[in-house]
A protein has these predicted regions:
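Short, small-residue-enriched loops and turns at beta-alpha junctions
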Residues: 132, 202-206, 231-232, 258-259
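Gly/Ser-rich helix-loop-strand patches that form or flank binding pockets
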Residues: 15, 19, 26, 111-161, ...
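Electropositive phosphate-/nucleotide-binding environments in soluble metabolic enzymes
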Residues: 69, 73-76, 108, 179, ...
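Small/aliphatic-rich secondary-structure junction motif
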Residues: 1-61, 146, 156, 164-229
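Hydrophobic/aromatic beta-strand patches that form the interior of the parallel beta-sheet core
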Residues: 34-36, 104, 125, 152, ...
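Structural beta-alpha unit
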Residues: 40-43, 73, 81-124, 219-250, ...
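A short acidic, glycine-rich active-site loop
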Residues: 57-74
Length: 284
């Protein structure tokens, strides 16, 4: 069951959309959303390799701190507005049976903030990377490779998702990553109205999809199995079949090859990250 959701944010304009996803989950599971804003250190904003006088340095540090204060204040007010819109209670701590959210301010590198808070979160929500603007890739990587926790990648939407984790699809290939993804999202699967296992049936040296179906049925999950013909575009096939069955969320293991290898040469995970129009819960 999802009780604590981490949402790392920065002033890139993507926080509203990701909060809408996290809020939908918080309302569904009566969870607690921790919105963690990473404030850059003023020293890190100084020109690199350029000698500047002490008075100018002091002025720049002061101006940087003022800008950071304004950004923080604006984002905090935005959170309060969004919380009211989604009917979520502002609370520093989780309240049993109530959807709540809290704002925390950290200073330093975002990857360190994600490490520190993500390792004790049931789910980490991040924006779908924007390749054109070079935004979000490092956040997704930090959450996936440095926390050991499930990460929901949230696609850009004009409004809050009407359904989330209601009809869940599982991309299954029998791998360790896929097995871990199922194990770490059992609470989601058990609460879903419907679960569809998507598989090519080619689980080499791994648990087959029929066995996964039986495993989930033993836990009371309403699950069905859809096998499809294998192609060289597994990621594309997964997304097409998600649309075919009407799944609102996809769960899959992430980057069985290295992230760099999949990014350069292509791979199922990278295709899904680049092209998915539905939320995807990734587990590495």
């Amino acid at each position: 069951m999802i009780r604590k959701i981490l949402l790392p944010v920065r002033g890139d304009g993507k926080g509203d959309n990701v909060f809408a996803h996290a809020a939908t989950l918080a309302v569904r599971y009566k969870g607690h959303v921790v919105v963690a804003h990473c404030r850059p250190r003023a020293e890190d904003l100084m020109p690199y390799g350029i000698a500047i006088s002490a008075p100018l340095r002091k002025l720049l540090l002061s101006q940087s701190a003022n800008v950071a204060d304004q950004v923080e204040d604006g984002m905090r007010k935005e959170l309060e507005s969004l919380a009211a819109r989604f009917g979520i209670t502002l609370s520093d701590k989780a309240i049993p049976g109530v959807a709540t959210t809290a704002w925390i301010e950290e200073q330093g590198r975002q990857v360190d903030v994600i490490k520190r808070h993500g390792r004790l979160a049931d789910l980490i929500c991040v924006a779908k990377p924007d390749v054109d603007r070079n935004l979000g890739t490092n956040t997704l990587k930090a959450a996936l490779f440095n926390t050991g926790r499930p990460v929901m990648m949230c696609p850009p939407l004009d409004s809050a998702p009407e359904r989330l984790c209601d009809h869940v699809a599982i991309g299954w290939n029998g791998s360790v990553e896929a097995s871990r993804a199922v194990a770490m999202t059992l609470g989601v699967l058990e609460e879903a109205s419907e679960v569809t296992v998507l598989s090519t049936g080619a689980e080499v040296n791994g648990a087959d999809s029929e066995s996964l179906k039986e495993y989930l049925q033993a836990r009371g999950v309403n699950v069905k199995l859809l096998r499809f013909k294998s192609s060289r575009k597994i990621g594309r096939d997964l997304l097409q079949h998600c649309a075919q069955v009407g799944a609102d969320t996809l769960i899959m293991g992430a980057y069985s090859n290295s992230h760099e290898t999949e990014t350069v040469f292509g791979g199922a995970t990278q295709y899904v990250v680049d092209h998915s129009g539905i939320p995807v819960i990734l587990v590495h």
